[in-house]
């Protein structure tokens, strides 16, 4: 989330006249991320303050966005801790701001933990499984837009910027994933709406108090979501939450906690167990490709902070080398 499109307090106040959320008290740009323009918004209504997030979409179109926004609404209505879109006085949850499609959603409580514990990994695994099950009856459909068709499109554009072993891996792994995605086993894997970007900075935790243990504040930033294999969503999450950041190697204890918590809610199938390593490779490749693309073919942004692509190159190399890697769970289901 970066600030590509600046918005003034006066501009946001005029836009908010279409909502029943009160008057503007503060508007602050969110510098992290690389896709959309985001602001924390504080309003006052009836003597109380309220916190929201306003998002202007820089790449996604008004035709694509209903999938994401109504998915968030659907999940929130099914008890999943996610931001809820706020409808305007006319009932619409999407309207233009500064020439871009925009929305306002509730701000979740808590903070991110970039050094997660095994307990937090288990909490995330449990809620991710519940999110997948809650999305089964979501009626809208849109594929993950950063999957194989996109890799096929952008990898040729990236190749001139990389050389040697890096270029060899980029090309060889694309060929491996083309074979995997084209297999009957891949086609049979269970699927549904997925977050597709559930990194540590997209999850909030409310800290423990004297009266309650630490608990999940929620999942947010659903704007890479799409219908995909559930195992891909798990692999994306494990590749960020359960790794040694210096080497890209998996942390067995954190991974075990996440996978077993997920499996207790939505048991993995035999086919998912067989293709765990393939999917970890796919998840690593997806983010390596997108980071290479953003790094070498950047867009202008007022507060853009591009991610280092070499991290996911290390992660991918580790997954390619890990030939004996399996799902560390009780017996999967058929």
Swiss-Prot record:
Tell me the domain of life.
Bacteria
Q: Which GO terms describe its biological process?
A: threonine biosynthetic process
Pathway assigned in UniProt: Amino-acid biosynthesis; L-threonine biosynthesis; L-threonine from L-aspartate: step 4/5
Q: Write out the catalysed reaction.
A: L-homoserine + ATP = O-phospho-L-homoserine + ADP + H(+)
Query: Which keywords belong to this entry?
Result: Amino-acid biosynthesis, ATP-binding, Kinase, Nucleotide-binding, Threonine biosynthesis, Transferase
Gene Ontology terms for molecular function: ATP binding; homoserine kinase activity
Q: What class of enzyme is it?
A: transferase
Q: Which SUPFAM superfamilies match?
A: Protein kinase-like (PK-like) (SSF56112)
Q: Identify the EC number(s).
A: 2.7.1.39
Name the family the entry cites.
Belongs to the pseudomonas-type ThrB family.
Q: Which HAMAP family match?
A: Homoser_kinase_2
Q: What is this protein called?
A: Homoserine kinase
